[in-house]
């Protein structure tokens, strides 16, 4: 029985899942918008949102935890210097998942995952 077992297997081994979500989280924080399948997007929330919550309190221990989970110095810097400050007053819900149709080929449901308060291209141009 699978009672009280949370999370999706996504037809991968545990090490493959861990590596995949680590890479997806790094891509999300780097680009602030990624396109993936809907089940992966929903599971990515469970990895990425705690990292942003961790970044709201800047300490050496938290930076080391974030580096352990992302393995990227640049992303740790962005998390603590930019994203942690951006979401300091928000109590969670840092990601938005938007369904965007089905993939050609296997008809898999696709979704965009984006950071909630990200600067869009139009806002960046109008700010200048």
Curated annotation (Swiss-Prot):
Disulfide pairs here are none
Q: Which GO molecular function, any one, fits this protein according to its record?
A: structural constituent of ribosome
Return the similarity comment.
Belongs to the bacterial ribosomal protein bL17 family.
* Protein's UniProt name: Large ribosomal subunit protein bL17
A Gene Ontology CC term for this entry? cytosolic large ribosomal subunit
Tell me the organism.
Answer: Pseudomonas fluorescens (strain SBW25)
Keywords carried by this UniProt record: Ribonucleoprotein, Ribosomal protein
Q: A Gene Ontology biological process annotation?
A: translation
Q: Which InterPro entries match?
A: Ribosomal_bL17, Ribosomal_bL17_CS, Ribosomal_bL17_sf
């Amino acid at each position: 029985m699978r009672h009280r077992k949370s999370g999706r297997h996504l037809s991968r081994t545990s090490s493959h899942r861990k590596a995949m979500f680590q890479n997806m989280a790094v891509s999300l924080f780097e680009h602030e918008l990624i396109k993936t399948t809907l089940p992966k997007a929903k599971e990515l929330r469970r990895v990425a949102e705690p990292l942003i919550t961790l970044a709201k309190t800047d300490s050496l221990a938290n930076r080391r935890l974030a580096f352990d989970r992302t393995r990227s110095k640049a992303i740790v810097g962005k998390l603590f210097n930019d994203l942690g400050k951006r979401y300091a007053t928000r109590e969670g819900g840092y990601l938005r998942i938007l369904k965007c149709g089905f993939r050609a080929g296997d008809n898999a449901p696709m979704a965009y995952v984006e950071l909630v308060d990200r600067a869009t291209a139009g806002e960046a141009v109008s700010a200048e």
